[in-house]
Amino acid sequence: MRWWDIEPVMGLELELFPEDSWSHGMYWSELAEAHPGGTRHYTVATTGDGTVVGYAGLMAVAGEGDVQTIAVAGRHQGTGLGAALLVDLIREAARRDCTELLLEVRVDNPRAQRLYERYGFQPVGIRRGYYQPANVDALVMRLDHPSTEPKDIEDLHHG
């Protein structure tokens, strides 16, 4: 993700997460750390004409990774794009020597929970009232020892 992606990402952000969307400033702050040696990794998915249809971000510090965000435009959900973005984050976490990768997902989003489970994430806790202002709980999930090896990821996906 580059600075010029922030506007189209914000369009998706507001569409997909109207109650608890990130601000422009939050994305600018995240991108400020997305450089060689930085603590962030962000990626966007685009169509052939350059339209942003998905994005994802990772924070990696001291061997721990955290999925900051992952989103796919509604019309592209169910196409494997979310899985591709997740695999990118898993591989990046492994490249950064993370021994675990954490994420939060809304408890009322079973589709996303199933995606994460297919790639080896396990539930480890609940954060009460995490998503505001709707006061929705977050399920905390963890993947131990993320891998850069495609076969490992494929084994998780098909196993």
Where are the model-predicted features located?
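Conserved catalytic-core motifs of GNAT/GCN5-like acyltransferases
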Residues: 104, 117, 122-139
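Short amphipathic helical patch at the helix-1/turn junction of helix-turn-helix
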Residues: 72, 106-107
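Conserved GNAT acetyl-CoA-binding A-motif
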Residues: 93-104, 127
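Short glycine/proline-centered loop/turn elements that form peptide/ligand docking sites
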Residues: 86, 108-112, 129-134
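Conserved phosphate-binding and hydrolysis motifs of nucleotide-dependent enzymes
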Residues: 54, 80-82, 109, 120-121
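Acetyl-CoA-dependent GNAT
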Residues: 3-4, 8-79, 86-96, 144-148, ...
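Structural motif
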Residues: 96, 114, 118-119
